């Protein structure tokens, strides 16, 4: 089994994923933009091989790394990372190299957008918090948000609908905090409010 692991060293304490794959007999093929020497020893010893690219943002370079590994080790069975940021890169690699496991670009939105995840949970019968997606914060969106706050009460949690981790997450616990959020939220970033 060949596992292409993007940025295998990040976060540093997640090397266990690579180590356990290796223990199961997998070739763990790392692609990253960090110098090999800077990767923790636990991660380095878990990798079969590491291919350094100038930047993981350079899809062509990552694609060439995957092609190199395929030429050397055979078909890639899994493309993984431990960083939500690389979901689109993983999906494109799966599509380009016909990897049968994992999300492809066409179905990536179901796991990338919090509002779409909630729709999936609801279809599966999993209860979720009531929510509102706010695309921009013009007068109509501000009014809808204030109405949502009146109906649901405080506190509300606001976070980017498409975002990594808890970055730019707000706890709104009063009408004054809601007013501040409306005034400061970037117009171009869709937010999900729960």
Pin down the residues of each PLM region.
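Short amphipathic alpha-helical segments and helix-helix/interface helices
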Residues: 15-22, 118, 145-146, 179-182
């Amino acid at each position: 089994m060949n596992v292409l692991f993007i940025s295998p060293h990040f976060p540093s304490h997640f090397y266990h994923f690579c180590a356990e794959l290796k223990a199961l007999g997998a070739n763990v093929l790392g692609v990253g933009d960090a110098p090999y020497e800077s990767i923790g020893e636990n991660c380095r010893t878990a990798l079969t091989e590491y291919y350094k690219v100038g930047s993981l943002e350079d899809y062509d370079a990552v694609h060439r790394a995957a092609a190199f590994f395929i030429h050397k080790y055979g078909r890639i069975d899994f493309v993984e990372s431990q960083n939500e940021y690389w979901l689109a890169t993983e999906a494109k690699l799966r599509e380009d190299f016909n990897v049968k496991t994992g999300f492809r670009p066409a179905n990536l939105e179901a796991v990338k957008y919090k509002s779409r995840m909630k729709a999936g949970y609801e279809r599966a019968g999993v209860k979720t918090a009531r929510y509102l997606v706010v695309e921009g914060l013009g007068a109509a969106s501000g009014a809808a948000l204030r109405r949502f706050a009146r109906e649901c009460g405080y506190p509300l949690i606001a976070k980017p609908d498409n975002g990594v981790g808890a970055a730019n997450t707000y706890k709104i616990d009063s009408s004054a905090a809601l007013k501040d959020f409306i005034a400061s939220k970037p117009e171009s970033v869709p937010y999900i409010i729960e």
